[in-house]
């Protein structure tokens, strides 16, 4: 089965057939923030696509032929071409498909977006550390790290004097960093943006975007997934289905 809410494919499953002409396939996982980047771009650009969910706790053998790292997201087109690594898949979609351009044409503005992505780059690993941390001392130290990283992003918005990181409308960089901010509430980390008012306004503006709101995961589902994921349960990726 394919689709956003289809159960994931695991070890022993048969590989899906060829991608139909005129479509593109994303190998994804419903709760993965890296895969969400690519799903946001697919939705924002209105690209016809199918979704194959992968069980990351029980990966199918054939999936390593799609991506030697065994990670999502992976894109596969009807020519059998494979593209992986989330930021690369997003740039590919923007260049390969018509419609709204999410990356700026201007080389300097494009470079600015990539530099902001570098400024953000510690946040995903901090989220991973926070999820796995076991004691209050770890929590306190990690929360301080989050505040430091968010201050850097606050400075970008302050200097730009715009609502979004690429200007006055949503662009690629906003979609690339959003999935981790979406999860702050579920992880009880909202207080880490209390000192960054412009970042809080950006988060509120992002939730108003039709693409973002269509792909939001409820706090309950995210916490349910996380509980099973930390137990290494193969059922984690299908939580709520």
From Swiss-Prot:
Which residues are modified to Phosphoserine? 129
Binding annotation for glutathione: 59, 72, 85-86
Q: What is its EC number?
A: 2.5.1.18, 1.8.5.1, 1.20.4.2
Q: Which UniProt keywords apply?
A: Acetylation, Cytoplasm, Oxidoreductase, Phosphoprotein, Transferase
Q: In which tissues is it expressed?
A: Ubiquitous. Highest expression in liver, pancreas, skeletal muscle, spleen, thymus, colon, blood leukocyte and heart. Lowest expression in brain, placenta and lung.
User: Known CDD domains for this protein?
Assistant: GST_C_Omega, GST_N_Omega
Q: Establish whether keyword Transferase is in the entry.
A: yes
As for family, the record states:
Belongs to the GST superfamily. Omega family.
Protein name per UniProt: Glutathione S-transferase omega-1
Annotated source species: Homo sapiens
Which lineage is the organism of this entry classified under, starting from the top rank?
A: Eukaryota, Metazoa, Chordata, Craniata, Vertebrata
